[in-house]
Amino acid sequence: MEFAMKKHAQEWIAEIEQMFKETFPKAEEMLQTIVVEFAPARNWNRKREKAAQLCGEETSKQQQIKNNLACKHDVPIYGEFIFGEKGQAILLRTEVLDRRGIFAEVLFHELAHGYCYWLEKQDKNFPVECQLGRCENEETQLGYYVWKEFIAQTISLKICQEKQIKVCKYTDGELKAYLTWMIKGTFTESDMGMFCAEFFFTDGNDKRLSEMMKNQDELITDDVRQIYHLLSQKLREKDYEKANGKFLMQLGECVARFRLDKLTQRLFNAQKNLQRAS
């Protein structure tokens, strides 16, 4: 990165970290432990591996990330929070420096990951094995995957809104297409978390959700509505950024039912098509 661009980036980082501290004063200690690095798209994998080694990231986590990247090779990665026994780092795509709004949204998102990771470590009752995908309770693990992306993006969008930083909002049509894709196609729990955050940010409510779910299977509609209400209640809490094992398990149970009902509906439709063809 050129010197002028690097200086420019450091100024932005300092401003954004200050805004984050104003929203979450307790984050100051966490911010002192995180290093922010940049990598262009062409060198992302190599730079990520180096950062992971410096942070002491567990091999299993590195493999999990590689598998995720392989599944979503056409989806650009703009940032990532990396953690391990030696430290924490945030890796950002150099290209995000082209637009301040995108840069702020991405960095707030990764800082939120770092802050929530720090909060989880402070909580003796939190199932920290979720952080490495090792929770024995499958529902709790599923809930954590949805939650960590939902809360990171929610925090990012909230701060951007409070600080009047312009970000790209999803339209109703885009959100409906996103939801339909999750219902009809293959999705990850992270995708669901991001959808829910974007839906709430666009003043999503029960009525709008019902309109988006028109003509969908009744069981699937009920599953999505339960996830919506669970997250909606969580956001009304004073310390909404903190989660516990009970909440994660409840969320994960809803997600597991959604996946099962999706599969049931797909098999039912396939059977109907076979009957029509015969």
Regions flagged by a language model, labelled:
Residues M1-E80, R257-A277:
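A metal-dependent hydrolase signature that marks the N-terminal structural subdomain at the beginning
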Residues Q10, A14, H109, V146-F150, ...:
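A structural signal for well-ordered alpha-helical segments within the folded catalytic domains
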Residues E22-L31, K121-K124, Q161-K166:
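Surface-exposed helix-capping loop/turn segments at secondary-structure junctions
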Residues E57-L107, L111, Y117-W118:
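Active-site scaffold of zinc-dependent metalloenzymes
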Residues G101-I102, Y117-F150:
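Post-HEXXH active-site segment of zinc metalloproteases
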Residues G114-Q122, I155-E162:
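Active-site catalytic microenvironments for nucleophilic, acid-base chemistry
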Residues I155-M182:
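Short helix/loop segments within enzyme catalytic domains
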Residues G173-S278:
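Pan-zinc metallopeptidase signature
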